[in-house]
């Protein structure tokens, strides 16, 4: 169903659907696509037929891994939806989706309330200032409790929900919602599966008598919040005058766009109830590209010089690439969010992040993995583009005559790795291609060659992440390979400072020799997502010629790759070049690079080197009778219990546990709790490994 791209940006919404892994996010998106007329048969996740889940593994596992971008239309408005994965191993997908969205629908499970992953995703959305509406889903589920879920939004997220709907009935008796803005009831009475319209029709009725008091109570709270936005409304409200529906909606919109409140709706996507009012709320309350602040970037030559781009087709062209995917027919697809200007297919643009020219090939607006070709891209929209060769996630594309670099995204370092060995020479070549393609798509996927064993090591964000990457290598690229056991990505750092360390590199073997003399200081520094190492030059009087100083830095960075304790990369080090000397004939960049590397290795040995390991934030939900066993087990894994809370019928235990102790945890937890407990885990931070454990790791690495 090809409809034209809307040029009136007031009628455009770029939104994401975000949630915990099982809150029903993909089902909700499927229903949106059904009601907006794009799919004719609803894809059920448990049939493996969901339209948005388009990679083979997604359909098998029933989880969404890649954020498919879809365009649909609702009441003459255009909604561009990005479906984001809720599994913690795929935080990078969520992060890059949020970066290019204007608003989001946070889907919560009506029984579980705010779950750990909902919290992680919510915090990521806070980071990018994304306005949200909340959809309490699965109201038909046994144990569903709308009011409990709203409480968890307050208590666990510290957010300010504004209830604009109440459920009519719950569990098997859930049949509709009360609209508190228009004070009416919407009911879906058809058989949830047999109804030909699949919930497309609903009745508008009077509010049921038994819910009238509750509706009045929540309506009063709603009006109070709304009236406070504006003096004129406040006067009207306290003067006893009725506020009009238009006034209420405008006030809710203003508060939502400013992220002061989060409207809460409810329904059951699976039972086709409550989805259309949620779509209305997307249009009524979430921002259009014109409601969000203009995009800021900086000058290509001067990072301090800020440039503003408004979402207007007359401004110079600028766009951010937020995802690269390999399409079975078209090859490399780059998803872009266009922030300003417009540009036609076939035009030349510049990738200002890399300083490379690119040509825009075919352009599509995507429906999951089907494509609707368009002739040009225009401000405020999301597109998939073919033909970009050098552009990767986070790069800026812009007008060659009017360049800008938009703020990119930061991605976490991988915490887990696995060795992979191709079975034949042909597989070795295929593996090379697979690695290159997958790394283009996924910035948290890294690879390296182990110098000693010659093995290829792939690194990722968790066991599921690596499983899926290996699975894709086998399926999409036909790589036959043996895969090792997952290994923890340890790091090394220093705890002490070495104020002065001298090193002279001298080599004389006839002809011109090599000479470099340096004095360095090394000290610990705080590690951030952007910075794990710093180099400072304090040499005065030209004692080390300027052209050799970058070589010292490069030598130290080389040495950081292979730590001195057990060969793991070193982080959290600041190195300062204090002094040195050069020889007119024998000094060279190579000599100073070697000196930098050797001086650092020697100094690091004296600087109290220690081993670091990834600590995972683990949350376990268990029935109370197994709580003692679960806590005992976490303690035996060197876990530190952080908190214990009550949630609906279960105990929630949060702990920090070293990743190395969490392999195989899912099976152990199942057997200890008869399969009734569930857990989730996300990367927390790096922490020092206790000495006894560190000694064992060092010995093992040296013995290999």
Curated annotation (Swiss-Prot):
It is found in: Cytoplasm. It comes from the Bacteria. GTP binds at residues 19-26, 83-87, 137-140. Pfam families: EFG_C (PF00679), EFG_III (PF14492), EFG_IV (PF03764), GTP_EFTU (PF00009), GTP_EFTU_D2 (PF03144). SMART domains: EFG_C (SM00838), EFG_IV (SM00889). Coiled coil: none annotated. One of its GO terms (cellular component) is cytoplasm. The keyword Cell membrane does not apply. Residues 10-290 form the tr-type G domain. Keywords: Cytoplasm, Elongation factor, GTP-binding, Nucleotide-binding, Protein biosynthesis. GO terms for molecular function: GTP binding; GTPase activity; translation elongation factor activity. GO terms for biological process: ribosome disassembly. Transmembrane segments: none annotated. PANTHER family: RIBOSOME-RELEASING FACTOR 2, MITOCHONDRIAL, TRANSLATION ELONGATION FACTOR G-RELATED. Catalyzes the GTP-dependent ribosomal translocation step during translation elongation. During this step, the ribosome changes from the pre-translocational (PRE) to the post-translocational (POST) state as the newly formed A-site-bound peptidyl-tRNA and P-site-bound deacylated tRNA move to the P and E sites, respectively. Catalyzes the coordinated movement of the two tRNA molecules, the mRNA and conformational changes in the ribosome. Belongs to the TRAFAC class translation factor GTPase superfamily. Classic translation factor GTPase family. EF-G/EF-2 subfamily. This is Elongation factor G. It comes from Clavibacter sepedonicus. The gene is fusA.
